[in-house]
Amino acid sequence: MDSVIESEEGLKVDSPNRADAETSNSKIHEEDEKELKTESDLKEEKKKTEKNKQEEDEKTKTVPFHKLFAFADSFDIILMILGTIGAVGNGLGFPIMTILFGDVIDVFGQNQNSSDVSDKIAKVALKFVYLGLGTLVAALLQVSGWMISGERQAGRIRSLYLQTILRQDIAFFDVETNTGEVVGRMSGDTVLIQDAMGEKVGKAIQLVSTFIGGFVIAFTEGWLLTLVMVSSIPLLVMSGAALAIVISKMASRGQTSYAKAAVVVEQTVGSIRTVASFTGEKQAISNYNKHLVSAYRAGVFEGASTGLGLGTLNIVIFCTYALAVWYGGKMILEKGYTGGQVLIIIFAVLTGSMSLGQASPCLSAFAAGQAAAYKMFEAIKRKPEIDASDTTGKVLDDIRGDIELNNVNFSYPARPEEQIFRGFSLSISSGSTVALVGQSGSGKSTVVSLIERFYDPQSGEVRIDGINLKEFQLKWIRSKIGLVSQEPVLFTSSIKENIAYGKENATVEEIRKATELANASKFIDKLPQGLDTMVGEHGTQLSGGQKQRIAVARAILKDPRILLLDEATSALDAESERIVQEALDRIMVNRTTVVVAHRLSTVRNADMIAVIHQGKIVEKGSHSELLRDPEGAYSQLIRLQEDTKQTEDSTDEQKLSMESMKRSSLRKSSLSRSLSKRSSSFSMFGFPAGIDTNNEAIPEKDIKVSTPIKEKKVSFFRVAALNKPEIPMLILGSIAAVLNGVILPIFGILISSVIKAFFKPPEQLKSDTRFWAIIFMLLGVASMVVFPAQTIFFSIAGCKLVQRIRSMCFEKVVRMEVGWFDETENSSGAIGARLSADAATVRGLVGDALAQTVQNLASVTAGLVIAFVASWQLAFIVLAMLPLIGLNGYIYMKFMVGFSADAKRMYEEASQVANDAVGSIRTVASFCAEEKVMKMYKKKCEGPMRTGIRQGIVSGIGFGVSFFVLFSSYAASFYAGARLVDDGKTTFDSVFRVFFALTMAAVAISQSSSLSPDSSKASNAAASIFAVIDRESKIDPSDESGRVLDNVKGDIELRHISFKYPSRPDVQIFQDLCLSIRAGKTIALVGESGSGKSTVIALLQRFYDPDSGQITLDGVEIKTLQLKWLRQQTGLVSQEPVLFNETIRANIAYGKGGDATETEIVSAAELSNAHGFISGLQQGYDTMVGERGVQLSGGQKQRVAIARAIVKDPKVLLLDEATSALDAESERVVQDALDRVMVNRTTVVVAHRLSTIKNADVIAVVKNGVIVEKGKHETLINIKDGVYASLVQLHLSAST
């Protein structure tokens, strides 16, 4: 093996003069690089500081409030105007009531000795009823108007955000965002924005109009007393403002730390097979919990500051009262005010200023909404440099398809310091086929990305038909270019819809025709739902070959002038490859075709082959021309491929390898890849999700069955039990809440005593008012202590609960068996939404709701006791009214519960659409599918939108009726009181004592019913979370029970295995499969695509359990072994390795649960031939690999993945197509690494390249779910008409 050339160093040749040339060149290069490096280092540092600064800013930046409504249409504006009118009217209800109230007091106070009090009161009572009717209408308008317009605008913001995200250039996704963040913003942040522009605005307007109304009335009744009371207003305003500022700062900080946790969820769930295989559950959990801690801190701090602010507000209010009572007494004596007038002024100022106090939840909602809107609106405003929605630019009748890259300099935006092309030029004449070959990372795929205009070169130009690509209308030119890439990205919808992405409004006929051309119609017709079969998230329900043919059909439907094939067949087995290649050959006719490949067989027939090396074209010509120069780069590539194989399969091998090479580099650039990678994350095995059958995906009807859509009701105690550790906090908080609750009724007693004092003789009036004033001040001090205590204790408990629920739920998710993630409702998008939004809502069920409930109970009890002591007859009469008020609150709660449930689930579906599209942004861009995605998204949002509107109307009715009932019961109580006074059953001060004690209790109740939307949302959220927490994982990696063998030999046996994937119970994968693998030997599984090869690997790792039969390791059934230990004995290397967005070091250490020593990491990297290229990177082992590893080439990723598998020193090695995606040189290096690590380990290889399989100790041929042949290569090849022999034939014919 002397000839192994380290792939990263380039093709070095032994001829002396070449070597000299290289050394001198390399010297020059080194100097260039030095200069570049110092510049780039400076830039890096600058970039870092800028980035930190940006992050700091982001924490606190907000949008001006009026900007939240930037996206309203005319109907919204009408709704908001109506809502505003309603809110103003509703807000004036209370100030007007104070006038009626003063009348009542004067009637009672001035007629203490006459007997016709009830007639005079009857007149006033009637006015109360009219006022009730007015507020009913106003409240209805207010709530419905604002709720509906808020729902509509939030929907529009979601769509606009998605739309702008979809039109961004690819660089934006490489550098600035990732799928987790986008979905998080769409599901979490829009809720906050909607909150800030919906009913909360109505409420704020209502409160402001109460404030203004109150003061206008007070000044008209008596300006002097009002002025004295107003002197305290600045204090109120200042404490209120300080409060709002602190809250908004904290809210945005909490969001930032939670967004980081969301990324952990997306990465883990998206790559669950890798996590399971490397028993990385603990690591993911601790990573997640780290981010939760900072979110918890921010939450508690927010609670504490709110409490202090509100406490301050309260003491100011009570001192104002004290002042008013004392000074009001003076006014009666000196200025001849009546008692009623003084009370109108006190009440009017009081309701006015209290209304400001109640505005704090609105303020905090506005602040949170403004902070959330900042990032979203920034994104919506961002103008991409390459804008898919830009309609300017040239549109020709058609293009010929001449492509020219002229003197192009390019580096990826995510890695500006690495120059990919320096002065690269290439021209391709129309109708010809050009193949690009070269090592992994040489820039082949970059050419494809530039032709698609995913990126623009930094200098130089890309021209089509002689016109600079930038001059064309982007959408139009992309519609002329068809891309088929190595890992095709399919969307979570039906096969038909996936193909239809190729062409707007394609007919079923056209789609059928495209499937026939792509050789896909056969397998599609076999599926129970045919074209309507769902493909699963990222197409996981189909095998690799099937997905690729659908992708080809999609490209055919588009009928492009220019066809870009990026490793289109490298990931397929011989049979599928031949079929797909045939389909491609048919459609390549008369089109300009650019093929990136590393299997030379694919490129042989190209009109021109260009060999790219380190971003330059080193040779070009046809296959035969290039072979004439035996020292040329192309000849070397071929020789490399042939070195290790016998000619018979060399070509095919070559073919692959080159292809794959190409692929990899493409990948580098490509998020698409990264995207598509995602799919493979799901499908860690060569075939997606290990589901490689030729059969169909989950039939729709099954999905319905599998999701119990009706989530069980969760009892309040169940959630409360989770808060157990905080019981001391909750008890202290509850004590504070009880005290807080009693303050209002006591306040009622004070008022009635003051009323009585106002009608006493002058001397007594003077001393009484002074006494009560002091009592008011004491009450204020009490409130100042009790209020902050309540909020602090409850927010500690609440934030701990949210943290605990998120953590528990995530822990549970990570422990689910892999099959659970195959279900659509458990996709990474849906789980992310559950963890972020639902966990936060549950808090409303315990902490906050509990505080409110305890406080209300205390108010009610205190109120009742006071009332019954004062006058039991009147107390009964007033009490009879209270159930009406209570009933109204209850009806309102019920309505709210019915609605919020379905809306939540429907938005989850919509967020899945977004997740898919952003995850597959390259595919969306190349098929100009932005509008299509938007249509799908909007369609999914229609249902929740209608629900939201219904909710608005019903809430409005409930809200309005409650006011009407309230005012009518006032009228009734006063009239009843007047009759009792007439009859001498009670005195006038007792009437007021009963009245105030009970109304203050009622105020407490109505405040709690305002919580209802939150509590109903919370119980639905709790149900969705407990559905996860309660589900027992069928195969639980955290289960410590089970045997652990002291010494593993590595004998594996599968006996009579039958198996179906849980997500597709009607497709039998294995029927009675038997296979035994001896310790230390290598067994290769071969068979057609979809025969079940990768399924064997999934079963050996216990991702799934067989339906019947057993699998044993060293004679022990694996179900009886401890799962975590079992998985630590197996090392998996799959075709598309999933790397996490961490450093290379962290990715390798992941194999050992993150605690590998530096020496272990380096030696694993050396064994896997990765140490060389890693040391060559600027940051070495500390290089970040990017989301899904996009910053490394295919060969590099694969070697890191092998190092990761080796670091755990497994007894059993599972290689699932480990080298199929690599070019010749990388493959050689990787294969060499694999040969080293396979020694003394039991190895199971799934492969379709013969060279990889030939030397296996046993080859097993899988067909129709059983093993049909097994033996050594030499034996099997000689079976006449044997399955293996015919597969080999296929291979050879495919490769010639």
Curated annotation (Swiss-Prot):
UniProt topology in membrane: Multi-pass membrane protein
Compositionally biased residues, Basic and acidic residues: 9-59, 640-662
CDD domains named among the record's database cross-references: ABC_6TM_Pgp_ABCB1_D1_like (cd18577), ABC_6TM_Pgp_ABCB1_D2_like (cd18578), ABC_MTABC3_MDL1_MDL2 (cd03249)
Glycosylation site positions: 113, 409, 505, 519, 590, 826, 1141, 1240
Residues annotated as domain ABC transmembrane type-1: 80-368, 730-1017
Principal cellular location given in the protein's record: membrane
Listed InterPro entries: AAA+_ATPase (IPR003593), ABC1_TM_dom (IPR011527), ABC1_TM_sf (IPR036640), ABC_transporter-like_ATP-bd (IPR003439), ABC_transporter-like_CS (IPR017871), P-loop_NTPase (IPR027417), Type_1_exporter (IPR039421)
UniProt-annotated binding residues for ATP 2: 1087-1094
Entry GO terms, CC: cytosol; plant-type vacuole; plasma membrane
Phosphoprotein listed as a keyword: yes
Residues of the ABC transporter domain: 403-639, 1052-1289
Gene3D superfamilies in alphabetical order: ABC transporter type 1, transmembrane domain (1.20.1560.10), P-loop containing nucleotide triphosphate hydrolases (3.40.50.300)
Intracellular or extracellular location(s): Membrane
TM ranges: 77-97, 128-148, 205-225, 227-247, 307-327, 336-356, 731-751, 774-794, 865-885, 952-972, 986-1006
Ranges for region Disordered: 1-59, 640-672
PROSITE patterns associated with the record: ABC_TM1F (PS50929), ABC_TRANSPORTER_1 (PS00211), ABC_TRANSPORTER_2 (PS50893)
Biological processes per GO annotation: auxin export across the plasma membrane; auxin import into cell
Pfam families in the record: ABC_membrane, ABC_tran
Phosphoserine modifications at: 657, 660
Positions with a binding annotation for ATP 1: 438-445
Keywords, in A-Z order: ATP-binding, Glycoprotein, Membrane, Nucleotide-binding, Phosphoprotein, Repeat, Transmembrane, Transmembrane helix, Transport
Family label: Belongs to the ABC transporter superfamily. ABCB family. Multidrug resistance exporter (TC 3.A.1.201) subfamily.
Protein name per Swiss-Prot or TrEMBL: ABC transporter B family member 21
Originating organism: Arabidopsis thaliana (Mouse-ear cress)
